[in-house]
């Protein structure tokens, strides 16, 4: 209790915590030694102060230790396509559809997500609307990844340590450090990420945290239109993280021969509408939703290092859709998720 008070005092005085201090603070929270009032203070305090890469790193380390593991054979080759959410863009489920395209291109995808908080259709809502069963035990998720190339981990089942913070977070009702660490606590131990963030200021923070956490390769992106994805509307700010280091650049759709289109063409109002758009993309229909998926899938394939450059990755993404392989992955995933 005294440790919690001391570290909350530092946050209240706008002092940054070290990774170790944040790890220790989150340990107190996760193991039930912090009160609801203290958790609420942590939520509001970190929100007002602003989270540092070291604080994100420390929190992620703790919750990674507490996660229920998915027993995959080779976690270092898996990719997660995930966003922080909170961009209020109401786009269809681009990251999940991108996951099917990656799997169709031979990349094993371990998708980590939840039901909707801020969007019209969370990844779990979308998969359920497709007919998939999402609340699966770790061994079953591992089997799906191995046999189909795509598996989904429904976050609440894999993060029992997060239960302590649910009520205080809901009562305070602001975006906080807990929203930031979720995407980085993949239960399959993923080392490769295409990670979208809701604000440009967080791109480099996440990149530094990922580097310190030892990822093999990641792209952290924030797209024009304020979205946590590679944007078809305009430029996307990208930071690449690899074992060699960190570099940032701006990407434009024109680099892959894609014309800019309005994000209004990829917005939906429900999971069912998202399913309709997703199936049109995977069945080969031309248009803005397809372009949006191809841009994101290009970066996802590049993360897997199955392509030498973005143009090769783009061609692989097109082949995954146009050959019907991506749609086949979706159909097999839905079928097997209900059988196992």
Curated annotation (Swiss-Prot):
5-phospho-alpha-D-ribose 1-diphosphate binds at residues 83, 86-87, 91, 93-96, 111-119, 123. Signal peptide: none annotated. Mg(2+) 1 binds at residues 95, 229. Binds 2 magnesium ions per monomer. Its EC number is 2.4.2.18. InterPro entries: Anthranilate_Pribosyl_Tfrase, Glycosyl_Trfase_fam3, Glycosyl_Trfase_fam3_N_dom, Glycosyl_Trfase_fam3_N_dom_sf, Nuc_phospho_transferase. One of its GO terms (cellular component) is cytosol. NCBIfam families: trpD. Catalyzes the transfer of the phosphoribosyl group of 5-phosphorylribose-1-pyrophosphate (PRPP) to anthranilate to yield N-(5'-phosphoribosyl)-anthranilate (PRA). HAMAP family: TrpD. This is Anthranilate phosphoribosyltransferase. It comes from Aquifex aeolicus (strain VF5).
């Amino acid at each position: 209790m005294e440790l919690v008070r001391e570290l909350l005092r530092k946050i209240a005085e706008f002092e940054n915590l070290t990774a170790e201090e944040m790890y220790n603070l989150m340990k107190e929270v996760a193991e039930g030694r912090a009160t609801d009032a203290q958790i609420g203070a942590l939520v509001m305090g970190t929100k007002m102060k602003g989270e540092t890469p070291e604080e994100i790193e420390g929190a992620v380390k703790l919750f990674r230790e507490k996660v229920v593991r998915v027993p995959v054979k080779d976690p270092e080759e898996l990719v997660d396509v995930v966003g922080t959410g909170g961009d209020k863009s109401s786009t269809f489920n681009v990251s999940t559809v991108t996951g099917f395209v990656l799997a169709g291109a031979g990349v094993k995808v371990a998708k980590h997500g939840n039901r909707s908080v801020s969007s019209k259709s969370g990844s779990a809502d979308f998969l359920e609307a497709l007919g998939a069963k999402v609340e699966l035990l770790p061994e079953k998720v591992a089997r799906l990844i191995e046999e189909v190339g795509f598996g989904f981990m429904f976050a609440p089942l894999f993060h029992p340590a997060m239960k302590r913070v649910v009520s205080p977070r809901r009562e305070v009702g602001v975006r906080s450090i807990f929203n930031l660490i979720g995407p980085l606590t993949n239960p399959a131990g993923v080392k490769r990420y295409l990670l979208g963030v809701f604000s440009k200021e967080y791109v480099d923070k996440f990149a530094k945290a990922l580097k310190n956490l030892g990822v093999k390769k990641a792209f952290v992106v924030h797209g024009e239109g304020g979205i946590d994805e590679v944007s078809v509307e305009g430029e996307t700010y990208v930071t690449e993280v690899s074992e060699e280091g960190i570099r940032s650049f701006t990407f434009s759709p024109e680099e892959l021969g894609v014309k800019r289109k309005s994000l209004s063409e990829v917005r939906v109002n429900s999971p069912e509408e998202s399913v309709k758009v997703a199936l049109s993309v995977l069945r080969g229909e031309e248009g803005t939703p397809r372009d949006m998926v191809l841009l994101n899938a290009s970066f996802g394939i590049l993360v897997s290092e199955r392509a030498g450059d973005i143009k090769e990755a783009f061609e692989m993404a097109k082949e995954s859709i146009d050959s019907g392989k991506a749609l086949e992955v979706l159909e097999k995933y839905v079928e097997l998720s209900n059988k196992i």
